[in-house]
Amino acid sequence: IVGGTAADISQFPHQLSLQTT
């Protein structure tokens, strides 16, 4: 997942280390 939307963060917390919005 690229973008780090609220829904993405909820499902993929590891995305926080890649990109946060």
UniProtKB/Swiss-Prot annotation:
Q: How would you classify this enzyme at the top EC level? A: hydrolase
Q: Does the keyword Protease apply?
A: yes
Share an example GO biological-process annotation for this protein. proteolysis
User: Where is this gene product found?
Assistant: Secreted, Extracellular space
GO terms for MF: serine-type endopeptidase activity
For this UniProt record, give its keywords in alphabetical order, as a comma-separated list: Digestion, Hydrolase, Protease, Secreted, Serine protease
- What Enzyme Commission number(s) appear in the record? 3.4.21.4
Is Hydrolase one of the keywords? Answer: yes
- What Gene Ontology cellular component terms go with this record? extracellular region
**Reactions catalysed:** Preferential cleavage: Arg-|-Xaa, Lys-|-Xaa
Reading the lineage from the top rank, the first entry is: Eukaryota
Identify its protein family: Belongs to the peptidase S1 family.
- What name does this protein carry? Trypsin
Q: Which species is the source of this protein?
A: Apis mellifera scutellata
